[in-house]
């Protein structure tokens, strides 16, 4: 088992649903975890598919909550967005963009292939300083409340298994293969260096 706790990051596009659900569950399980988005803006569903609510990453969850409450309390209560923002603001003040974070992690979990590609591209574009490895793993999770919850438990189980390996570098591929068979999902995995 690694001597120090795993430093985990969970990344989706807007740092709202999938990454925050996993952040919530991992932090309750005692993990050192942060969550991020990779998008240029934060997007939340709006009154129509072509009318999303778009916010800057500097906007707090509380400000988003109050804005949507003012726009259409019934709609955003019914579709679960207000509930999600209420949870989010209890975890941290605002969404964070992965590309602006210079902290080091042992494990970065992404929630869709496009986000995985953006994270890997960002890490590879940085100047290598410590040569410390970071494992980037993609778990495809549909962006809805139910799938976010199921995905978060899967991510948590995966983190717990990795935390208990004797030698993460040599055991992770085998572990991921077991998880693929058990969950019926395919995981992308690569190693980048800081």
UniProtKB/Swiss-Prot annotation:
GO terms for biological process: co-transcriptional mRNA 3'-end processing, cleavage and polyadenylation pathway; termination of RNA polymerase II transcription. It is an enzyme of class 3 (hydrolase). Transmembrane segments: none annotated. It catalyses: O-phospho-L-seryl-[protein] + H2O = L-seryl-[protein] + phosphate; O-phospho-L-threonyl-[protein] + H2O = L-threonyl-[protein] + phosphate. One of its GO terms (molecular function) is RNA polymerase II CTD heptapeptide repeat phosphatase activity. Residues 160-186 form a coiled coil. Its EC number is 3.1.3.16. It holds the Pfam family Ssu72. It is found in: Nucleus; Cytoplasm. One of its GO terms (cellular component) is cytoplasm. Keywords: Coiled coil, Cytoplasm, Hydrolase, mRNA processing, Nucleus, Protein phosphatase. Protein phosphatase that catalyzes the dephosphorylation of the C-terminal domain of RNA polymerase II. Plays a role in RNA processing and termination. Plays a role in pre-mRNA polyadenylation via its interaction with SYMPK. Interacts with GTF2B (via C-terminus); this interaction is inhibited by SYMPK. Interacts with RB1. Interacts with CD226. Interacts with SYMPK. Belongs to the SSU72 phosphatase family. This is RNA polymerase II subunit A C-terminal domain phosphatase SSU72. It comes from Bos taurus (Bovine). The lineage of its organism: Eukaryota, Metazoa, Chordata, Craniata, Vertebrata.
